[in-house]
Amino acid sequence: MPVIDVAKSDLERLTGLKYEEIAKLFEYIKGEIESDSGERLRIEVTHDRPDHFSAEGLAKTLKGIAEIEVGLPRISLGRSSIRLVAESITERPYIAMAVVRNVRLDEEAIKQMIQLQEKLHETYGRGRRKIAIGFYDVSKIKPPIYYRRISQEDEYIPLGFQKPVKVREMYELTEQGRRYSGLINRENPPALVDASGQIMVVIPVLGSECCKITEATRDVLIDVTGTDHRAVANALSILIYSLLERSGSKEVEIVEGGTGYSHEYVKIYVDERAVSEFLGVKIAHEDFIKYIKKARFDYQEGAVIIPPYRINVLSWVDVAEDVAIVMGYNQMPREVPEIPSAGRRHRTEVITLEVRKSMLSMGFTELNNYVLTDEAVAEVCSPARVANPISELYTTIRCSIITQLISAASALKRRETKIFEVGEVVREGRTVRALAFLISRDGATLTDGLSVVKSLCKRLGLKCEFFPAEAKWALPNRMAEVRGEITGYIAEVNPDVLTALKHAVPTVVAELYIG
């Protein structure tokens, strides 16, 4: 899960609370203090609350729980005098902008802005493929702003540079250029250009020194571009409400032009009795309203009003979860079922334990991934898809563990990797327990995988046989099907699949179904 870095003093300033009080309140939010270095905290937050990816979002939630500020966060909406003129950019057709006025920034505030930007890029933005975000000092921009293509021969001063360079040089000279220029037409990339002709940003690669945010900035322009209209709007909502925590006047101006942005609250009609039954505790109407407001929602005639930055709230069940969180899980009733029973381990659990011991003894490292995953799993099987995913990271129910292991090996960036996972996958409409392992090193072959499976079957006392098999994602003639008391497959992964998953080392994988 995402881990964010915040200063204790900044959280204290944003909430008006002492750190000792803040630490106690973490029991009531979806977050956990991972480490405390004295002046700074590392806080683990959940993927479904991207508004918690910075100190401002955490402060907003904490103030609600502490009843310092309750109900919908205050916002004063208006129309900006800045105009956006947008061309049709096929690879990133959606763009929305807003200005947050009267912000007070210091070094820590700018750190939090950058952290929120990068965390959204990494998770919700799918590594800038789905959305890209920019911040600009309004006082340094001459409107109107043009969203159009430029030439790679054009010059600008990239962030961190002292003098102008050509855009094509920026691709090679900067880490961002090397990493993200492949997402766009490199010869004629999309950019924001103001009326004076200065390039504000090459999207989604790197911004410009010309209008960067500093501690002297008072009015911040936010832009979000992307491939999905809803994702662009959701990201802009999160960014607006985050910066509002630094604004004295709570003024936000929506920039007209492009695909636009509509600030809208969501109404969810909630049956209070259903919430009480769902949580197993009777909640009086007055208390229900109190909990709703502490969660930074509002209540009107049977409907709960959800602010636009709470993109994880999709139904009354999500509202019930927030009620439980702000009420405190320690308020939930606890009962021991009055059912006499003699427990024993299920056969699948016995095999799972022995499999783990065996894999660890053979030098493998165990991983634990989520059952919900992204579209990459479709490289090796046909997954069931989530109808209303909250994030591009969790759009499918995994039908294989293989792609998650390859992605993990890619992230580790080692020349030799031996990893495994035991967990659930869905095959042919049924949930089954699977063991998957990966061997990644120069010279890795099918023989390496066969050796591990044979050793495993021998240790477990299981009979297994091997037969030739083929799959699109495997190298031709380099795959074996496992049959017997356990079933599955072993294969050398096709380099094209490895490239798609950003892994460059020869790799052998296996997946065995053990229960």
Swiss-Prot record:
<feature type="domain" description="B5">
    <location>
        <begin position="263"/>
        <end position="334"/>
    </location>
</feature>
<keyword id="KW-0030">Aminoacyl-tRNA synthetase</keyword>
<protein>
    <recommendedName>
        <fullName>Phenylalanine--tRNA ligase beta subunit</fullName>
        <ecNumber>6.1.1.20</ecNumber>
    </recommendedName>
</protein>
<keyword id="KW-0067">ATP-binding</keyword>
<keyword id="KW-0479">Metal-binding</keyword>
<dbReference type="InterPro" id="IPR045060">
    <property type="entry name" value="Phe-tRNA-ligase_IIc_bsu"/>
</dbReference>
<dbReference type="GO" id="GO:0000287">
    <property type="term" value="F:magnesium ion binding"/>
</dbReference>
<feature type="binding site">
    <location>
        <position position="321"/>
    </location>
    <ligand>
        <name>Mg(2+)</name>
    </ligand>
</feature>
<dbReference type="InterPro" id="IPR041616">
    <property type="entry name" value="PheRS_beta_core"/>
</dbReference>
<feature type="binding site">
    <location>
        <position position="322"/>
    </location>
    <ligand>
        <name>Mg(2+)</name>
    </ligand>
</feature>
<dbReference type="InterPro" id="IPR005147">
    <property type="entry name" value="tRNA_synthase_B5-dom"/>
</dbReference>
<feature type="binding site">
    <location>
        <position position="318"/>
    </location>
    <ligand>
        <name>Mg(2+)</name>
    </ligand>
</feature>
<dbReference type="GO" id="GO:0004826">
    <property type="term" value="F:phenylalanine-tRNA ligase activity"/>
</dbReference>
<keyword id="KW-0436">Ligase</keyword>
<keyword id="KW-0648">Protein biosynthesis</keyword>
<dbReference type="InterPro" id="IPR022918">
    <property type="entry name" value="Phe_tRNA_ligase_beta2_arc"/>
</dbReference>
<dbReference type="InterPro" id="IPR004531">
    <property type="entry name" value="Phe-tRNA-synth_IIc_bsu_arc_euk"/>
</dbReference>
<dbReference type="GO" id="GO:0006432">
    <property type="term" value="P:phenylalanyl-tRNA aminoacylation"/>
</dbReference>
<dbReference type="InterPro" id="IPR045864">
    <property type="entry name" value="aa-tRNA-synth_II/BPL/LPL"/>
</dbReference>
<keyword id="KW-0460">Magnesium</keyword>
<dbReference type="Pfam" id="PF03484">
    <property type="entry name" value="B5"/>
</dbReference>
<feature type="binding site">
    <location>
        <position position="312"/>
    </location>
    <ligand>
        <name>Mg(2+)</name>
    </ligand>
</feature>
<dbReference type="GO" id="GO:0003723">
    <property type="term" value="F:RNA binding"/>
</dbReference>
<dbReference type="InterPro" id="IPR009061">
    <property type="entry name" value="DNA-bd_dom_put_sf"/>
</dbReference>
<keyword id="KW-0963">Cytoplasm</keyword>
<keyword id="KW-0547">Nucleotide-binding</keyword>
<dbReference type="InterPro" id="IPR005146">
    <property type="entry name" value="B3/B4_tRNA-bd"/>
</dbReference>
<dbReference type="Pfam" id="PF17759">
    <property type="entry name" value="tRNA_synthFbeta"/>
</dbReference>
<comment type="subunit">
    <text>Tetramer of two alpha and two beta subunits.</text>
</comment>
<dbReference type="InterPro" id="IPR020825">
    <property type="entry name" value="Phe-tRNA_synthase-like_B3/B4"/>
</dbReference>
<dbReference type="GO" id="GO:0005524">
    <property type="term" value="F:ATP binding"/>
</dbReference>
<comment type="similarity">
    <text>Belongs to the phenylalanyl-tRNA synthetase beta subunit family. Type 2 subfamily.</text>
</comment>
<dbReference type="GO" id="GO:0009328">
    <property type="term" value="C:phenylalanine-tRNA ligase complex"/>
</dbReference>
